[in-house]
Each structure stands twice: as structure tokens, then as C-alpha cells.
Amino acid sequence: MSSRFPLYIIGIVLFASFFSCTDMVPTKEVRLIDSLNGKAYAYRYRSLDSSYKYANEAYRQVNFYKSGKAEASNNLGFCAFMAMDFDRAEALHKEVYKLTKNELELLIADIGLMKICQRTAMNKEFYDYRNSALKRMKRIREESDLFADRHEALRLDYAFTEFFIVSSIYYYYLQQRQEAITSLNRIPEDEALTDTNQLLYYHYIKGSASLVEATKPEDRKMREFDQLYITWRTAVQTNHPYFEGNGLQGLANLMVSPNNFELFRTRRGYALDQFGFPVDSLLPLRMAQRALEKFREYNDLYQIAGAYEIGRASCRERV
């Protein structure tokens, strides 16, 4: 009996090392799928093609790890959304409801569907998914100690930050500016700062949607500029062409007005020198052209159209 006991213990240890505690899924599979999904997320604002490749590989490689497949489906839904294939994006996010009972991935699916409804002006459905997301967030807060794994902790921070950013954008388009600012202010600063994707998104929305607070119109313009400049500079440093383009486009839009351009040339001349263009009346047009190059590199049809419009507006102002 005593000679068999150590063998019994060794057997348990080997079994535990082979299987994770996630629905008795092999540990090797969990690590592989989490790694692929992590790469899909890391590339989402760097290269949409690469993000899709890793998410699709994760989706196809799953045998038992259903919450990992749900995460891959959410990542694929993001890629479809950015490609403006809203029907496919909706189907992929809704597939998550069938794949898992993991509240975190279900929350991220709700938020993905909120984004689709906002973009396609489906207001009632937006609030349906938002209310569902709020209920899930409440349950997750009550059981936050369950998300101790580093991968899940990062997903948790992303989900909550994304919820408040998406809500803020929705309020902005409804011209409910104070509600939009309040939503952004609910993002814990440490959560936004730990995720470069969300940090860039946060600064970009604050600047492009003018969700900054100032008593004087001139000061408000300066704060918008500063948020967009931070977006551009950080995106260049971290190789995020999507936000590099958005930062440039937002700044070009601010400077389309000759009066605004003179204001920024006077008070932010040191920043304008960093773009590598002559600081003259054609600077907004050159910045819009560079933004267009970045959006083409990333293959973002929605922002490509916006860059063309800003370029045309800049030309009209100077005719």
C-alpha cells in the first residue's frame, strides 16, 4: 500500500499539470489559444490583417477551450467591424453567446454589439446591449477575485475601459457632451494606462470629440490639440498606424481654420515642428495626406473617406 501511495500522488500531479482548471482543458491548449488571442489583440490597431490571422488561427485551433474560442470570435468580430462588414461582425459577437458562459467574454460581445448599433443608428438595440453589459459588469465586480489569471485580468481592464469609451462616443453623437465626458471620466486612469490600445483610444476620443474641460474656447482648443498630439506621438513611438493616422487627421481638422492654425503656430510651434513638414498654410493638407497613407497601410475604409474629406476642406479654406 505504502509503495503505491507515491505513485498515486505523482499521477495526480501529472494530471493537474496537463489540465488547466478551466473546464478541464489541457493546459497546452489554453496557453496556445491565449497566446494567439493575445497577439490578435496586440495587432488590432497595428495591422488588421495580422490581427485577423491570429484570431482566426485561435478560433480554428480550439478543441476544448470554449472560452478561448469565444475570445477569438470576439476578436474576429472586431476585425469585421473595422472592415465595415457589420453583418459578419454581429454574427461573430452573437456566436459568443452560444460558445460560453464566461461573463467576461459575454460582456465583450455585448460591447461589440453596442459599437455596431451605434455605427448603424440602431438606438433601441444599443440600449438593450448596454443594459445587458451593465448587468454583467455588476456581476463581474461582485466576483472580480475569480479573474486572477493575468490574461483574464487584462481582458477585464479592456472590457470596462471599452464600455465607457463606446458609451462616450454614443453620447457624443447624440450631442450629449456632458454625459460623454462623464463616461470617459469613469475610466480609472491606471486601467487606461496599462493598455496601449486603450490609452491611444482614450486620448484620441478626448481630443477628436472635444471631450475636454476648459472655461475659455481658446483653452479648450489647446487641450484638444494636446490630446491629439499625445495620440500621434505615442502611436509613432509604439508603431500603431491606425492611431498615428487618427492623430494626424484630428490635428489637421483642428487646423483647417486659418485662425486656429495661427493660434497653434503661436502657442504650439514646438509641437508642429515635430511632424517634419514646413509649418505653413499647407500643413493641414500635408498632415491629412500622411493620415491617408497610414489609413491605407492599415486598410481602414471608414477613416480613408474621412481623410479625403479633411483634405478637401483644407483646400477650400485656402482657395
PLM features per residue range, with description:
Residues 1-9:
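Bacterial N-terminal signal peptides that target proteins for export
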Residues 21-318:
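A "functional boundary" signal
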Residues 5, 17, 267-269:
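Short, intrinsically disordered/low-complexity patches at protein termini
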Residues 9-17:
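Bacterial N-terminal signal peptides
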